[in-house]
């Protein structure tokens, strides 16, 4: 996954900022995986359907993971 920890928190903050600011990408495949992404306009984790390939890091399997990483 994309959840990294460090004692200083430096790497976590850099990755968190990059992932959470990425746009929602459903991907180019046609599968249907329920996922969550952080919507930077609303400040909330929002459900979407992921196609299975070609997405980005703003793609979480659970609402809990999205909230934990993006602090929503």
Swiss-Prot record:
InterPro entries for this protein: Kunitz_BPTI, Kunitz_BPTI_sf, Prtase_inh_Kunz-CS, TFPI/VKTCI-like
Gene Ontology CC annotation, any one: nematocyst
Site (Important for the stabilization when complexed with trypsin) location in chain: 61
Subcellular localization: Nematocyst; Secreted
Official protein name in the record: PI-stichotoxin-Hcr2k
Record carries keyword Cytoplasm: no
Encoding gene, per UniProt annotation: iq1c9
Temperature-activity note from the record: Optimum temperature is 25 degrees Celsius. The ability to inhibit trypsin slowly decreases as the temperature increases to 70% inhibition at 100 degrees Celsius.
């Amino acid at each position: 996954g994309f959840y990294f920890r460090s004692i200083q928190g430096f790497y976590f903050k850099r990755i968190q900022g990059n992932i959470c600011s990425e746009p929602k990408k459903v991907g180019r495949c046609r599968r249907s995986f329920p996922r969550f992404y952080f919507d930077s306009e609303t400040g909330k984790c929002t459900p979407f359907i992921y196609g299975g390939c070609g997405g980005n890091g703003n793609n979480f399997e659970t609402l809990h993971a999205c909230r934990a990483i993006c602090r929503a």
